[in-house]
Amino acid sequence: MWGLKVLLLPVMSFALYPEEILDTHWELWKKTHRKQYNSKVDEISRRLIWEKNLKYISIHNLEASLGVHTYELAMNHLGDMTNEEVVQKMTGLKVPASHSRSNDTLYIPDWEGRAPDSVDYRKKGYVTPVKNQGQCGSCWAFSSVGALEGQLKKKTGKLLNLSPQNLVDCVSENDGCGGGYMTNAFQYVQKNRGIDSEDAYPYVGQEESCMYNPTGKAAKCRGYREIPEGNEKALKRAVARVGPVSVAIDASLTSFQFYSKGVYYDESCNSDNLNHAVLAVGYGIQKGNKHWIIKNSWGENWGNKGYILMARNKNNACGIANLASFPKM
């Protein structure tokens, strides 16, 4: 009985003594995430959103403890934002209207032999630290750079931070902080004959004029390959054989915004509504749940140190295999 009381506390606190506890919690949250507001009105409206999110998190975690969900949520630095605002300000996948796959760029998996049961490129030293795109729709640039970094390590043995800002400023087919697409980025690096390192061309989180300098060049690209649409088995092969792969997902749900640990699976995730680009750096299984290991670009304070485990072989959950691609180096 005591166990149930503990479980119900977070939900009950809203009903029993909301104000004092919430006041303290709110002040602590603001301090932790260095939040400042322009006016009292602004702060009140943000606090209402934060309270709604906190309640959502508490109820979800209560359900998770009763076995309803395979993942848990936690309050984070996005606490005073609605899920619509997160999509608007912190995603940025823009698929070209004319996008059609050609046989020239289609990845044809080598089905010989078995793919390993699990792969984690973080352990192999293929993955740079988690970055934060800020309030710029540049997810596509971070996803592209992550895939290029993996191939650079594979080819040269060197792990190096490449420049998403180079892509934000210089890929004319994309729209900078207004959004873009990964294969456009790979094509730019190919035509440009290179991409600068992060040190040579640091990230500023807004679109500026193109300042690419060949002296800062750290990697090249010979083109790209696209995974057959919606084919998770082909995506698994690509991750196992090639390295980290750029993928697009639906990141529009509140459950994604506050993901903390476990294997993320939300039936409301829409595989036809892809809005965010991330990086698949491996796959595996946790407590019987197959998953993809996904690197996000919302900083280390988001998710599990910047990562999320997303359901694998669950009918292409969140559309993870719909727009997957990787660069050739």
Curated annotation (Swiss-Prot):
Annotated catalysed reactions: Broad proteolytic activity. With small-molecule substrates and inhibitors, the major determinant of specificity is P2, which is preferably Leu, Met > Phe, and not Arg
Membrane topology: Peripheral membrane protein
Primary localization class, coarse: other
Source species of the chain: Macaca mulatta (Rhesus macaque)
GO cellular component terms attached to this protein's record: apical plasma membrane; extracellular space; lysosome
Protein name in UniProt: Cathepsin K
A Pfam short name: Inhibitor_I29
PANTHER family: CYSTEINE PROTEASE FAMILY C1-RELATED
InterPro entries: Papain-like_cys_pep_sf, Pept_asp_AS, Pept_cys_AS, Pept_his_AS, Peptidase_C1A, Peptidase_C1A_C, Peptidase_C1A_papain-like, Prot_inhib_I29
Signal peptide stretch: 1-15
